[in-house]
């Protein structure tokens, strides 16, 4: 009996200490958050919101409004700060203290990042080297004409749906579009957009984000993390598929590179990575893992987030026919000018009925750019990749302790009335002037923002512009498509289908 009483007392003491630890302010300026229960922390509230069918991004957005834009959350042992207070975000952008990623965050993060490798997850000189090498190579191999060519291929590949009046499901083709571009500039492989292999790659990328979008019990409690492999191998399989695909490309490139390194003209980004990290005859296992992770980071963001943004824009164009026509009028005027220029330059024999939008036309179609940005603001931006603090620091009158896991909550920032008038209203016109007091946050902030942001935006612009040039986009039943946000590592729409109505050729004629 005494032993039982002692055990009960020990448990009570542990629960009390853990409750105090999770809720006590270590500094008078420490951020606040909802009451954290012993052991589980705020997992209780998480499941409560799930029962109410309120997703994670909406739960955090509610807490953000309640706690002045910085919310303390405990998921088991894991302490996280979600930040939407823009003064603190600016501090993150400027202060070197907040540049790093938490390389040993949780098992899921460690697996996805190869223990803090690549571009997205590495730190210090390792990160600078990876980013510099990738950007330098992207400028050479990520040429504008490649994106333009693939956008035309996209338009042509979906023509069969218009001709047969079949329902068109964008997800597979948007992933095929971004995958095809990725494989060309990264591995110098020209694969058609509707290729079955690219469909498999797109599916694997989608599974990576879907299966790894939630923390598991093995992530939340450190004592259980060693058992992650045993119970969650199915979560890791999509990651393995993608990394094996990349490793195969790496091996093929090593075997086919020129014999003289100094005279070698790189064919693609993979060649440039091998030149930077290895040699023709051998490459260390550590560098091989780093190259693989760099490619994995680019693949997952390009095929995942860019393709999802294209899907969101297509969905919103269906739901807003009036705005679709405004954009189409801009495109029509642009094509008319291009057509007249061809004729005036003596190109009367040229096929002026088959002109397409190019990147040089972006300034002539401002409403489409605004529409894309507004779609990203309202629908596709959740929160950032995690940051960490190297040491204690006061930021905008809040105490950020050393080793904190920090997520910038873009979803809440974009719904803040201080920055966006009527923030829940879909209004692309807000991006047509300089009235928004904060910079674009769609691709992250500062030095740790997305290194390929301009290429990503070009892909979305050209894919949508040339699709609207050739087709009117409509819902299947004439009703609005459900645009409820599905939570993942990024915010995505439910799978949906649309109808493509071919536009009359008079659309581009005088």
Swiss-Prot record:
<keyword id="KW-0472">Membrane</keyword>
<keyword id="KW-0408">Iron</keyword>
<keyword id="KW-1133">Transmembrane helix</keyword>
<protein>
    <recommendedName>
        <fullName>Probable cytochrome P450 517A2</fullName>
        <ecNumber>1.14.-.-</ecNumber>
    </recommendedName>
</protein>
<dbReference type="GO" id="GO:0016705">
    <property type="term" value="F:oxidoreductase activity, acting on paired donors, with incorporation or reduction of molecular oxygen"/>
</dbReference>
<feature type="binding site" description="axial binding residue">
    <location>
        <position position="450"/>
    </location>
    <ligand>
        <name>heme</name>
    </ligand>
</feature>
<keyword id="KW-0812">Transmembrane</keyword>
<comment type="similarity">
    <text>Belongs to the cytochrome P450 family.</text>
</comment>
<dbReference type="GO" id="GO:0016020">
    <property type="term" value="C:membrane"/>
</dbReference>
<keyword id="KW-0503">Monooxygenase</keyword>
<dbReference type="GO" id="GO:0005506">
    <property type="term" value="F:iron ion binding"/>
</dbReference>
<dbReference type="GO" id="GO:0020037">
    <property type="term" value="F:heme binding"/>
</dbReference>
<feature type="transmembrane region" description="Helical">
    <location>
        <begin position="1"/>
        <end position="21"/>
    </location>
</feature>
<keyword id="KW-0349">Heme</keyword>
<dbReference type="InterPro" id="IPR017972">
    <property type="entry name" value="Cyt_P450_CS"/>
</dbReference>
<dbReference type="InterPro" id="IPR002401">
    <property type="entry name" value="Cyt_P450_E_grp-I"/>
</dbReference>
<dbReference type="GO" id="GO:0004497">
    <property type="term" value="F:monooxygenase activity"/>
</dbReference>
<dbReference type="Pfam" id="PF00067">
    <property type="entry name" value="p450"/>
</dbReference>
<dbReference type="InterPro" id="IPR036396">
    <property type="entry name" value="Cyt_P450_sf"/>
</dbReference>
<dbReference type="InterPro" id="IPR001128">
    <property type="entry name" value="Cyt_P450"/>
</dbReference>
<keyword id="KW-0560">Oxidoreductase</keyword>
<keyword id="KW-0479">Metal-binding</keyword>
